[in-house]
Amino acid sequence: MENATRIVFLGAGNIAGPYAESIARHPELSLVGVFDVDADKAQHLAESHGFAAFADLDELAAASPDIVVNLTSAPYHFQTTKELIGRGLTVFSEKPLALEPEEAAELVEAAAASGTRLACAPSLWLGAAQQAAAEEVLSGRIGRVGLVKAEVNQGRIETWHPAPGSFYKVGPVVDAGVYPITYTTAVLGPIREVTAFSSMTVPERIMTTGETFTPGRDDTWVVSAAFESGALLALTCNFFVGSKTQPRTVTFHGDDGSVVLDDWLLPGAGVRAAEYGEPLTELHAADDSSPLDWSLGVLELAAAIRDGRPHRTSAEHARHVVDVLDAVALSAFDGRRVRVRSSFPSPFKAVGATA
């Protein structure tokens, strides 16, 4: 497509392939190259998808990308994003924006000072099902939301993933709880207070190779949070219960009814709604043929640049999510309530009342 948004990757790890496949489905995006400190990884990805492998960051920047997608490992997000911003480049970062609240705040300030755009995953809340549920909540048809319940059941990753260590190093809240936390705050606004409990349910894990390891973080978490709006969130996150046993749902309960998103991950998930006291009825039909689209946030950022409007996957929102994740850890480890003070502009006001 003529005038397609030029995309480059920083990082060629496991998630880079799915990102490349998703971007290829959108002609308005053009993936032109990748740089990774592991040159072999970068070359393999480039050859597999038909774009360039850059020798270093200078060569990446010289390609004049419209957006750099930062797919480095989480511990490197802060430093690499900071360097990209320093080069005047627009960045879409994989989640989380940073591992520490102070680092996330520094990135937000750096982007604002340099006049560059900074966006961040997760962006799967921009999917069709997630937007349908959000639209129903924001329409006011279920009234004031008082309670949200969310389930993150990621199962025992070591039973299928060849290298599960990175998941267990950060734990289920940072790895996957970030999805419903990002989604519910996008819909309802900032969280102001958090309490959390955690435990090590399975202290010894057995990999597909037969090797054993001990998770670096507790594998089961129960989180309670209070939104600024007054609504409460009940969130469970674990690497213990499988999603086929207990679905990955998000349910909004309001004064006048409820909305159920059957899966916070899948764009083709079903959405059901009901007036108070009535049975749930289908609002958005499930579509198992809808693939995960990892490029939704990149697509949104590109569209916002073209339209001259704020992007919905804002750095301010991502910073708030980092603050919430930090509050969850502090609460569980210190046994106390933890306040969250950061705020962010509503992502739905960026393009109107709803997506």
Give the label of every model feature segment:
Residues 1-49:
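N-terminal Rossmann-like dinucleotide-binding module
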Residues 37, 287-298:
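Active-site loop of classical SDR/Rossmann-like NAD(P)-dependent oxidoreductases
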Residues 52-63:
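Short acidic low-complexity segments
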Residues 124-214, 335:
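Predominantly a Rossmann-like dinucleotide-binding segment in NAD(P)-dependent oxidoreductases
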